[in-house]
Amino acid sequence: MANTELNIEASAFSDGFLYLFNRSNNVIVKFDYQDFLSYLKTGNLPKIEISRISLPEIEKFEAGFSGATFKEKSQIIFTASVEATDDAYNDGEIIGSLIGVINISDFQKPKVIRYNLIPNNGENPIKVESVTILSSKSNDNTEVVFITDDDNGNTKLIKANLKM
């Protein structure tokens, strides 16, 4: 990850592996979970696998990872936000957010299966910071909660149903 700013925005766990999501350059870092825990105690860096995902642009700014959770063993539901800035740390004008699904069955070639913009409901653009699954009612219907941040200290929890 040379020449990449480090800004871990999300983590997810599945099948003995920890996945960290870097907002800058939309990189996913994969560790064996037990090796990662050992690293925290010993400082011995474990084997790292890295993949980069291309996410859509809104108004010429690429979306950046903001949240992630596993739906199934190889499917990650992710959120990404778009701000008018090229800086991985400092906030810019909020342009919008999206939700999507990534298939990581081949971690070296992960694929964004689908994504949708998250509607603003006539308000200012929403910046979604994370997502978690409340329940899976069926294979096609998943209830989630988003947490938003307007960069002014205000947050909201928003429940939504995703048709997968």
Tell where the protein language model's regions lie, with residue ranges.
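Sequence/structural signature of beta-propeller domains
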Residues: 1-164
